[in-house]
Structure formats: C-alpha cells, structure tokens
C-alpha cells in the first residue's frame, strides 16, 4: 500500500523525459561559433547535469516525487491558485501543521512539511518577494534566497527527486523572464556542487510559464556545443556568482592587481635607490593631516545639513507622539470605553493580538476628535510593540460614523512608526463600494506602506481562516446582518484547526 495516498492521474517524476533527451533546435552556425571560440561559457555543456533536469508543463500536485515546492505568503496561507491547489490535495492536516508547527515563513526563507495526501512525501514552502523597480536589487536577492534555501533543504533532508514550481508570481509583480533566470541559474550552480546527492529536479510550469522557461533553459543547461555558443548571445549581463546569487556592483571590493607603476615596467630598485637620496622633509611632504584632500567641503556641508533635516523630522515626530501619549495617560475615557469602539479581542492563529474597531459605535460628527486620537493611542500603544492585526467592522455604518479624510491623514502622521511597521493585516468586514473607494485613495496617496495589508471581507466567517471564532468578540448586530446577507455556514475554513475543531 502506498503510504502517500496514491490517486488517479499521478505522474512519476522518473518517467518524465530528461532535458538531455529533448530535441535541440537547429541553430544556425556562423557568428555564434566564432563567438564561442573567443569566450568560454560560464555554463558549459554538462551531460550529467542535463540528465538530472526536467522541464514539465503540468500540475505539481499530481507529481509523485520526494518533495514539491509551494510558493506562498508569510503566514503560509496564500490564496493563490497553486497554493490553494496544494492544500486542497494535501488535506486539512497540511494547514494544521503550517499553523501549529511552521508558524509562518519570512520572504526568501523556506520551510518543509509533510505532504499528507499529496503523492509527494514533503512540501517545501517558500515566500517569493514583491517586485518593485525601485527595490529591484532586494527583490532579486530575495528570490535567489528562495531557491537557494529550497535546495539547501533538499540536501539536508536527503531528498533525491523534487518538483520545483515557479516561485515568483505575477500576483507579486515579478517579471517572469527575470525570475526564470534566477531560478535556473541557482539550481544549475547547486547541481554543479551537490549534483551527486540529487537524482532529478523537475521545473514544473503551467501556461505562459512554459514558453518563458523553454526560452531560458538553454542558457543554463545547453545540450550541445552549438547551443552553448548560441546561449552566449542570450546571456544576461548579470550571471551571478558561484552560487547564482545576483551580483551587486556597488558592493564588490575593487582590488587593483598591480600598482600602475609596476604595470608600466618601472624599475623598482631604481625607484627605491632614488628615494634613498631624498631628504626626510621631502618624504613627508603632503602626508600631514592638514595637507590631505578632504573633498568638496561645500558638498559635505550640504549633505550634513540634509541628514540633519531628516534627523530633525524624526525627532519632531517622536516629540509630537510623546505629547499625545502623555495626554492619553491622563484623560478620562470612560465614555469611549462604554461605547466599545476600539478593543483587543484575543489573538489570531499566529498569536498576534487582534484589535477590533466597530465603525457604527464611533459617532465621528459628534465626537471630540482630539480626544478620540488620545483614546486610540491609550488602547494601542502597548499592543503595537509587536505584530498585530486589525478587524474593522464597517457593518451598518453611515456618514456620521466616518471621520473626515483630513483627520485620518493627521492621525496617520501622528502615530509612531511602530503602528505601521508591526501592522500585519487590516481586515475590513462588510465594506461598501464607497468604503472601498475611500480606502483605495487613502492607501494609495497617504498610507502606501499599509496598502498591501488591507483585505476586504464580505462576511464574518472569512475571518475564521485567520482567527479562531472563540478569539473574536463580535457585536450582535454584526452577526445578525451577516446571517441575513450571507446565510449560515457559507464558508468553510481551510482546516478543522482553524475552526477550533481540534
């Protein structure tokens, strides 16, 4: 009996055609040959490596291998098509292990779990980066880390066959071809060092990914000398270091192999003899501290002034926040407490405090907004010192419950940076169209740092994917509205652990 729970339509990784056996395109000889005679390829033909590599267009959840790779998010609960398919095929036990034992995964890291009902014995979870051209270098380094850490787990756990998915996703904005270069290059370098420990690495692609990988594969896994020569014309400028890691020129140590004088054949002995006749005074000319060139003093002064301005802004922000904090510790907030506008309600599955805001209880038009700011700070200041999440119930709220946009902007800039940094999710339950529009404008033009953390939920039960119902103190009118609009049991959480069934 197969302990992995074999099902129909499984594909044995060992039955897939190896890259070395696939047909090679008819490359036109000529300029490529002359180029290959002048330059050595950093990725030469290697029949042994090519016999370990597979490019397969298929469903990774059907692949019978020692392990498969799943691209997910930091909480190991991504709702992308691939991740959902993996969890659906594995069964609820996989999510239970992710929540109870793995406890999240940072971008660039990789963690391993059992495969449960999957044909693969293990699942290696990794979190790909979000791509932003402004932070391209960081994204490239993080994606490299995903593949490097994945292959490290392969070696540590003595995994001989693995199906590797495309870690970079269009959902996170990563250019597919750029991601393919990093993936293939990193695995190639790994196989060069540790190939004896691995039998098969299958790059599992779907749809448009297949075209991209078919184009890039020959660069890092050429099948003959003609393809190797052709690959030189397609080689990117950055081919990585000995591990495949992207090279950052600004961080390279520049060492001159020879002093300029020696490169021009100057006689060292003659130079030393001439130096011996110099007066001691001459030897020290220009070596005193006051004679050393120190750069453009005007430019340095401007830079110091700029840094000083930035520092002053930070100091001023902290001073303003401390003033509000002192007020928060002295005010009487009995009225706000009775209204239950803002309160902590248990923790989520990762142990992060859950802060609840009930919009209907906040009569913004008739409230001293200054006092409201102080109240919010009094409740949140100690909570936000660590990771936390916010649940905002928009249910039955009206215009009088919504503070002006100017107030939200001011509040955003008043609070300490820890509020933004440690906020991991902001769930808006029962949002209206207008609420979605206002949120989009606010997170786009004012609070861009939290935009990716906002999630709109049309029903309360969707919260149970992240928070146990026992940990939520939900107003009765919210539950009544939710039942009226959505009915009962309209959503089943991904595992019994999430619903408190275990």
Curated annotation (Swiss-Prot):
Q: Where is the CRAL-TRIO domain?
A: 329-486
Annotated SUPFAM superfamilies: CRAL/TRIO domain, Macro domain-like
Kindly name one Pfam family recorded for this protein: Macro
The Macro domain covers which part of the protein? 40-221
Q: Which InterPro entries match?
A: CRAL-TRIO_dom, CRAL-TRIO_dom_sf, Macro_dom, Macro_dom-like, Macro_GDAP2
- Fetch the CDD domains from UniProt: Macro_GDAP2-like, SEC14
Top-rank taxon of the source lineage equals Eukaryota
Q: Hey, which family's this protein in?
A: Belongs to the GDAP2 family.
Protein name stated in the entry: Protein GDAP2 homolog
Species name: Nematostella vectensis
């Amino acid at each position: 009996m197969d302990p992995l729970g074999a099902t129909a339509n499984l594909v044995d990784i060992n039955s897939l055609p190896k890259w070395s056996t696939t047909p090679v395109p008819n490359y036109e000889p000529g300029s490529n040959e002359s180029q290959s005679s002048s330059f050595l390829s950093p990725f030469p033909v290697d029949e042994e490596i090519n016999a370990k590599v597979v490019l397969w267009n298929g469903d990774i959840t059907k692949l019978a291998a020692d392990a498969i790779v799943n691209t997910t998010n930091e909480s190991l609960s991504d709702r992308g098509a691939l991740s959902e398919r993996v969890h659906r095929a594995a069964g609820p036990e996989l999510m239970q292990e992710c929540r109870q034992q793995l406890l999240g995964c940072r971008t660039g890291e990789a963690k391993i779990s059992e495969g449960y009902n999957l044909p693969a014995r293990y699942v290696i979870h990794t979190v790909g980066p979000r791509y932003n051209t402004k932070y391209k270098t960081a994204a490239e380094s993080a994606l490299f880390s995903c593949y490097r850490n994945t292959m490290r787990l392969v070696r540590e756990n003595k995994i001989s066959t693995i199906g590797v998915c495309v870690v970079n996703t269009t959902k996170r904005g990563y250019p597919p071809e750029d991601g393919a270069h990093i993936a293939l290059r990193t695995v190639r370098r790994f196989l060069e060092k540790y190939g004896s420990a691995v039998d098969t690495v299958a790059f599992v692609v779907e749809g448009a990914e297949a075209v991209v990988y078919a184009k890039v594969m020959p660069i890092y896994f050429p099948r003959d000398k003609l393809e190797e020569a052709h690959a030189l014309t397609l080689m990117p400028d950055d081919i990585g270091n000995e591990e495949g890691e992207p090279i950052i020129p600004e961080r390279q140590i520049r060492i001159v192999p020879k002093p300029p004088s020696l490169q021009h054949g100057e006689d060292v002995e003659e130079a030393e003899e001439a130096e011996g006749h110099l007066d001691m005074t001459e030897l020290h000319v220009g070596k005193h501290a006051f004679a050393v060139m120190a750069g453009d003093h005007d430019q340095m002064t401007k830079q110091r002034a700029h840094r000083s301005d930035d520092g002053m802004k930070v100091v001023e922000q902290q001073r303003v926040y401390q003033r509000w904090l002192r007020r928060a510790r002295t005010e009487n907030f009995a009225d706000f407490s009775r209204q239950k506008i803002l309160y902590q309600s248990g923790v989520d599955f990762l142990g992060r405090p859950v802060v609840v805001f009930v919009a209907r209880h906040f009569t913004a038009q008739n409230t001293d907004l200054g006092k409201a700011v102080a109240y919010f700070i009094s409740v949140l200041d100690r909570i936000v010192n660590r990771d936390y999440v916010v649940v905002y119930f928009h249910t039955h709220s009206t215009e009088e419950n919504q503070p002006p946009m100017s107030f939200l902007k001011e509040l955003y800039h008043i609070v300490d940076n820890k509020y933004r940094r440690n906020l991991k999710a902001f769930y808006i339950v029962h949002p209206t169209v207008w609420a979605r529009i206002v949120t989009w404008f606010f997170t786009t033009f004012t609070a861009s740092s939290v935009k990716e953390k906002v999630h709109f939920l049309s029903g309360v039960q969707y919260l149970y994917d992240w928070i146990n119902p026992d940990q939520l103190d939900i107003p009765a009118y919210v539950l009544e509205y939710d039942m009226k609009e959505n009915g009962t049991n309209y959503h089943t959480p991904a595992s019994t652990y999430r619903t408190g069934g275990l």
